[in-house]
Regions:
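Active-site-adjacent "subsite" loops/lids of carbohydrate-active enzymes
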Residues: 29-31, 35-47, 118, 122-172, ...
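Beta-strand-rich modules
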Residues: 459-481
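Substrate-binding cleft of secreted/luminal carbohydrate-active enzymes
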Residues: 273-299, 314-389
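Aromatic- and acidic-residue-enriched segments that line the glycan-binding/catalytic groove
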Residues: 74-89, 124-149, 186-209, 254-266
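Solvent-exposed loop/turn segments flanking beta-strands in beta-repeat/beta-sandwich domains
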Residues: 417-443, 484
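Catalytic domains of carbohydrate-active enzymes, especially glycoside hydrolases
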Residues: 47-74, 176-179, 278
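Active-site neighborhood of glycoside hydrolase catalytic domains
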Residues: 162-169, 175-184, 188-262, 266-303, ...
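Pro/Thr/Ser/Gly-rich low-complexity, intrinsically disordered linker/stalk tracts
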Residues: 368-423, 479-491
Length: 491
């Protein structure tokens, strides 16, 4: 019986691993707003983040979404907004010893072959538990631009000045930091709170932009912001990916019989005034990550119903699913959800990845979640999904591929391809290994041994009698892959 169970486990593992796609977004959110870094010194926070990144890489994660602006503040050096209290414990106080978490995280992610997406909360200016704002905070300097709501401060989306300010903050990030993506989450107009009313009747009556319905007017305010942010990114660094992670329900069918889902919950369109599908259809965003945090069988918002709805409706841009690790483990649904993802992933489907909420739960291996990722579901590395709507070219081939003995052992070296412009330049390389005589199929991710920013790879030399074929390709900023270069090597 024990042998039979072991055999079945090996078969399941083999089938699951072989079904992995070569291209898949495997992200994880690292948030600061939960206070996990407060009270840490520079060295402890760097050590904590290094450990998290190492564990996430082992789990197969290839992109980190790092929160850098939770309440019109900054986890990076900014001339526009104060240092975040979620970094130092007091808003406006610089870290000591001094460091720049965003700059540091970019370097740490890139050297591990991972992308770094800077995550901002665009309109939230104060969280409920923030008692003191720095003197240079926008709510202190320009209080007329924000409104209070259920203990929060919100930058009023009705003001063009606010939309312009957020775009200026983003442009500053893009100009000074080598980020791969710019990410915003589900906070637009505030989540409805009992007894609270959004105080924007004056703005609506004085500047309604031709709208007679205040809900349509609010949606238009957010739409204008999304379009302006898209245009800002395109103007500054067109290769940077713009992603949005909305609440998991667009509209319920009872509100919209044609485009609503068979759900009964809060709605992006009606309650947060966020018309996600419009942004996807217009091409204003580059990827969409709905937060489908419920379990399969949830009566108000069934996971399977929602993942199928988003796959059917979010068709003009890559779709990644926001996954709640703790809830998935609680209901014992990791295998079932993964099988559902696998059945929907593919070249003809908008579903092209997953983002884990939240990174620390994977690092802590809640319910064995991380173990299953690294050993079964994400056993092999994955490249990022293609985005031909941003750029469809590819880098040239690597040059002068050659194994050389060094003081560090046997090392495979190559030179970067020549490039005509920055967007086509190689920024990472993929190294594949095949046994001698084996078919060279670089679409099979089981042959990937490294995704690296370096122009070398340390070879696992044994006795010099085993023959292998190594293949090296180059990736540009959008993970377009070059033609392959082969090298026969004895190890």
């Amino acid at each position: 019986m024990r042998k039979t169970l072991l055999y079945l486990l090996l078969v399941i593992t083999s089938i699951t691993a072989s079904a992995q796609n070569k291209r898949e977004f495997r992200g994880a959110w690292i948030q600061c707003v939960n206070g996990q870094f407060m009270g840490m010194g520079t060295q402890q926070m760097q050590s904590t983040l290094s450990y998290q990144l190492e564990e996430l890489k082992r789990d197969g994660v290839n992109a980190i979404i790092f929160q850098v602006r939770p309440e019109c503040d900054a986890l990076y050096a900014s001339s526009y907004e104060p240092w975040s209290r979620f970094l130092t414990g007091r808003q406006g106080m610089a870290p000591s010893p001094y460091w720049d978490p965003l700059y540091w995280m970019i370097n740490e992610c890139h050297r591990r072959g991972m992308e770094l997406h800077a995550w901002i909360n665009p309109f939230r200016a104060k969280t409920k538990n923030t008692a003191e704002l720095a003197s240079n905070h926008i709510a202190r300097q320009r209080p007329e631009l924000v409104f209070p709501y259920d203990g929060l401060f919100i930058l009023n989306p009705a003001y063009q000045e606010n939309r312009t300010f957020i775009c200026k903050v983003v442009a500053d990030i893009l100009k000074r930091y080598d980020v791969d993506g710019l990410h915003i989450d589900d906070y637009f107009y505030p989540y409805p709170a009992q007894g609270c009313v959004i105080p924007d009747n004056f703005e609506f009556s004085s500047n309604n932009n031709g709208f007679s319905n205040i809900s349509d007017w609010r949606r238009n305010n957010v739409n204008m912001f999304i379009k302006e942010l898209h245009d800002t990114i395109e103007a500054v660094k067109p290769w940077v990916k713009f992603g949005v992670s909305p609440f998991g329900i667009y509209r319920n069918k009872k509100s919209d019989p044609k485009r609503g889902s068979m759900t009964n919950g809060l709605q992006n369109y009606d309650d947060l005034y966020a018309d996600i599908l419009l942004w996807v259809e217009k091409g204003w965003i580059d990827y969409c990550v709905p937060q489908i945090y419920w379990e399969i069988g949830n009566k108000a918002a069934d996971y399977k119903t929602l993942i199928n709805w988003w796959t059917a409706n979010c068709t003009n841009r890559p779709l990644y699913i926001g996954e709640d690790i703790e809830r998935t483990v609680k209901f014992g649904q990791q295998e079932t959800k993964h099988q559902l993802h696998t059945s929907l992933l593919g070249h003809n489907s908008p579903l092209q990845g997953t983002v884990l909420w939240y990174a620390k739960a994977a690092v802590d291996n809640v319910g064995g979640y991380g173990t299953n990722l690294r050993n079964i579901y994400w056993r092999y590395p994955a490249l990022q999904p293609l985005m031909p709507f941003k750029h469809g070219g590819k880098p040239g081939k690597v040059r002068k591929v050659k194994p050389i003995w060094t003081s560090d052992g046997y090392v495979l070296f190559w030179e970067a391809p020549k490039s005509r412009n920055y967007i086509n330049a190689a920024c990472k390389y993929v190294v594949y290994r095949f046994s001698k005589g084996e078919s060279i199929n670089i679409e099979d991710p089981s042959h990937i041994v490294a995704i690296t920013p370096n122009t070398w790879y340390n070879l696992p030399y044994e006795n010099g009698k085993q023959k292998y074929v190594y293949v090296v390709t180059a990736l540009d900023r959008l993970s377009n892959e070059s033609a392959k270069v082969k090298k026969n090597i004895k190890l």
